[in-house]
Amino acid sequence: MEVLIHKSVYYKIFDKTFNNSSHRYIQENHSINEAEILANIESITNYFKAQDILILNQVHSNQIVNADEHIVTIPEADGSITTKKNLVLTVQSADCVPVLLASDDGKIIGVAHAGWQGSINNIISNIVTKMIEKGAKNLIAVIGPAIAQSSYEVDDKYYKTFLSKDINNKRFFINSIKENHYMFDLPAFVELKLNESGVKDIKNITEDTYTNPSKYPSKRRSYHMQVPYNEKILSAIVIK
């Protein structure tokens, strides 16, 4: 468990080195046993000695859930915020960028799943705005492990989508050895969006999910190796 705000906010990146979980947290297909999922979720909750945990049904959106309000058990969204103590907020990832946020007074926390679609459609500014509306000041962020630029090849359509939003996004792409393809720096793009939203205090975990198979699940690596993909990194944060 890592300290984000002294004596109030704590977080952890639950990767493959955490042995008390099979790293499956939502039933995406029938090959995953519900009892296994519940045991994994309970293991994370117990790790923090927390009262409750929020798992999201992530859909690559820019939607943020206010967990202070009554919500469904597994809401369809890609981020959440809360002022509640002992409620663990989580996001799942396996190449996309997990972002953890806290007000420096330790009273408000948030999490966001920043894939390329959510990132280009303002999930970062959405969550920062919602936290500020609840009274957050001087936000601190953690950018979790994600796919690195050297591992993330994209096509020309993807490249043009980003440039159509802002020509300056060109800086996050370099040419691939493959014609009409590029290598994209998603973590750097997410960091820019945090900076543009006023978040300057950022801890960046710069480990590449794609090239660390013993530590991190990677959807793209699984696809390239033609092996089943059903594990996730769980990034979690809590107010104590």
From Swiss-Prot:
Organism superkingdom: Bacteria
The record's section on SUPFAM superfamilies has: CNF1/YfiH-like putative cysteine hydrolases
Q: Which Pfam families match?
A: Cu-oxidase_4
Reactions it catalyzes: adenosine + phosphate = alpha-D-ribose 1-phosphate + adenine; S-methyl-5'-thioadenosine + phosphate = 5-(methylsulfanyl)-alpha-D-ribose 1-phosphate + adenine; inosine + phosphate = alpha-D-ribose 1-phosphate + hypoxanthine; adenosine + H2O + H(+) = inosine + NH4(+)
Give the GO molecular function terms. adenosine deaminase activity; copper ion binding; oxidoreductase activity; S-methyl-5-thioadenosine phosphorylase activity
Entries under InterPro entries matching the protein: Cu_polyphenol_OxRdtase, Cu_polyphenol_OxRdtase_sf, Cytotoxic_necrot_fac-like_cat
For this UniProt record, the keywords arranged alphabetically read as follows: Copper, Hydrolase, Metal-binding, Oxidoreductase, Transferase, Zinc
EC number per UniProt: 2.4.2.1, 3.5.4.4, 2.4.2.28
Q: Which residues of this UniProt protein bind Zn(2+)?
A: 60, 96, 113
Q: Which cofactor does it need?
A: Cu(2+); Zn(2+)
Could you give the subunit structure recorded for this chain? Homodimer.
Could you say which protein family the record assigns here? Belongs to the purine nucleoside phosphorylase YfiH/LACC1 family.
* Its biological purpose: Purine nucleoside enzyme that catalyzes the phosphorolysis of adenosine and inosine nucleosides, yielding D-ribose 1-phosphate and the respective free bases, adenine and hypoxanthine. Also catalyzes the phosphorolysis of S-methyl-5'-thioadenosine into adenine and S-methyl-5-thio-alpha-D-ribose 1-phosphate. Also has adenosine deaminase activity.
The name of this protein is: Purine nucleoside phosphorylase RP494
Q: Which organism is it from?
A: Rickettsia prowazekii (strain Madrid E)
